[in-house]
Amino acid sequence: MNDIGIEIEQLNMPSITSLENIKYIKALGGTYGEPGHSLTGTTPFNSRNFKQEKPAIIYISEISHNLNNKSYFYGGGYYRRSGIKNVLVGKYTDKLKQIEVVPPQLDNIDYYFEAKYKANIGDTVIGAFRTQIFVTRSDVVLIEGLKYDRPIISAVYDSLGRIKYKYKGVKVKNE
């Protein structure tokens, strides 16, 4: 742009900003890095390296129905390139089963996942994958206090980041 007479004062670089590549943003003249998945520790770099950043998001759903000895659960906000392989399913944390997931078709965004196991309807599903929250009808629940083993729900947001509920110290039930 400078070559054609347009002065650039700010250069916002694309997503996947992380501690690993922020030095390159600076070296390339970038003044901003899109936070995106760096806030949740779910950049492609984080799938193999947790030295500097740890994933800070989990996906919670429930088994909605069964068909032909397989279970299905809602997967709103799934990012089709995330490579989900397994989820944990069950009623109690000490009895969760690791279940293989059949990823949905690439052209879907809010849909049901198929789990290769017949679980109980209503069982909790816990997954970890790269999300696209802004294109879903799902909510985001902020939980604080995990570092101190005292989790509390502090707020619920819609997919556009608007606050739906704000809580003061609601304790998470830990069975």
Predicted regions and their residues:
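Active-site loop/helix belt of alpha/beta enzymes
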Residues: 1-49
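A generic structural signal for short, solvent-exposed coil/turn residues
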Residues: 3-5, 55, 105, 119
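A residue-level signal for beta-strand positions that form part of recognition/binding surfaces
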Residues: 30-32, 60, 70, 124
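A general, composition-driven signal for non-globular sequence regions
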Residues: 46, 59, 110-114
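Intrinsically disordered, low-complexity segments enriched in polar/charged residues with Gly/Pro
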Residues: 49-51, 103-104
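Short coil-to-beta-strand transition motifs
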Residues: 53-60
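C-terminal accessory subdomain/extension
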Residues: 68-175
